[in-house]
UniProtKB/Swiss-Prot annotation:
Keyword Nucleotide-binding: yes
Its biological purpose: Trans-enoyl reductase; part of the gene cluster that mediates the biosynthesis of fusamarins, isocoumarin derivatives that show moderate cytotoxicity with IC(50) values between 1 and 50 uM. The polyketide synthase FMN1 probably synthesizes two different polyketides, a tetra- and a pentaketide, containinga varying number of double bonds depending on the selective actions of the trans-enoyl reductase FMN2. Chain fusion will presumably be mediated by the KS domain before finally offloading is catalyzed by the alpha/beta hydrolase fold enzyme FMN3.
Biased composition (Polar residues): 144-155
Binding positions (NADP(+)): A186, S187, A188, S189, S209, P210, A211, N212, Y227, L274, D275
Region (Disordered): 143-173
EC code(s) of this entry: 1.-.-.-
Phenotype upon loss of function: Impairs the production of fusamarins.
Any GO molecular function: nucleotide binding
Family as reported in the entry's similarity comment: Belongs to the zinc-containing alcohol dehydrogenase family.
Name this polypeptide is given: Trans-enoyl reductase FMN2
UniProt induction comment: Expression is induced when NaNO(3) is used as sole nitrogen source. Expression is positively regulated by the cluster-specific transcription factor FMN4.
Domain Enoyl reductase (ER): 7-370
UniProt source species: Fusarium mangiferae
Amino acid sequence: MKAMVSNASGGYCLNSAMPQPSPMPGMMLVRVEAVALNPYDTKVIEYGIITPEPYVGGCDFAGVVVAAGPGVTRFQPGDPVLSMHTRGGFAEYALAFEDMSCHIPKGMSYNEACSLGLGIGISGLALFQQPGLNLPLQHGQDLSDMTGNGRSNGYTNGHTNGHTNGHSKGEEEQKDPVIVLVAGGASASGTMATQLLKLAGYNPIVTCSPANNSLCESFGASACFDYNSTTCGADIRLHTDNSLAYVVDCVTNVATMTMCYEAIGTQGGTYIALDATANTVKYTRRDVRADWVMANTLLGEPCKLDGVYGRSSAPEHREFASHFFRLAERWLAEGKIRNHPLEIRTGGLESVDAGLQDLRDGVIRGKKLVVPLHVGA
């Protein structure tokens, strides 16, 4: 089969003779219809995260189930599916985990669907698990069994159902929703985090360019702040009456981290990023817990990497993902989650490397890059 594999120059090249994978227990073989491009796909090469060669990139994809491995019960051949993985999507056929996949709802194209999987996984991890913000899901969204039988399996992301930040359900109903800041609200990760926060019962506010205020508000942001303003952090602190305690940073650089630290109230709080945090900022406030999440841990396996990217196995993250993707599937079917604005690239797999270079160069603003592998995806 054809696939885009990493090369020595730090990019991806087409290999037309890659073996077609076979599904292991709990996995499915998917004929890929469309793939989305993410900064992660460049970092795995630039930081030497993946060895040995060849490495097939691609963590966001959608397609049709061709074969189901042993133990798969939710999907069958012919089902349209969206999924996330840490590799393998830049190919004609890819493996998908049953418990990290969603049925594509009627009316959603493969181009739209392929842009959702990684965002659901990484945003869910950043918001509702350790080492992320570990926010309780509210309004009864307790990650109970999503098979439709109405019975809870007892999984509540470590919190008692109906309780939020130490308050009882009765107290919660008398209070305004807890505010959470999403830095980089106009990014694909930002709009997904905003939607998930809103669905979980929180009040998301965001930073973005003023030109993207309407976009962010359409995804559920209650207030937008200009990240270019020198008073952005102070403006947010004023808006939140010096009480902001939760921040997720979808940009993750020194400037945004500094701004987020300025926005967090004097009682302190939690700052979570989607990449390694800068120590130059991290320890400027001892009352702020700063950490970051990475998609690899959603698999529940150790990340055998050098430096800050090395992580031990986190089986609780895999357990969380298996339940959260069920919940996300329901929200998708109900039309409560939608995709970020897309930029469609023609040329099939061979256009992937040029698209990733555009991500590196910062050419893409306010769009998620998608590459359809077949006409009409």
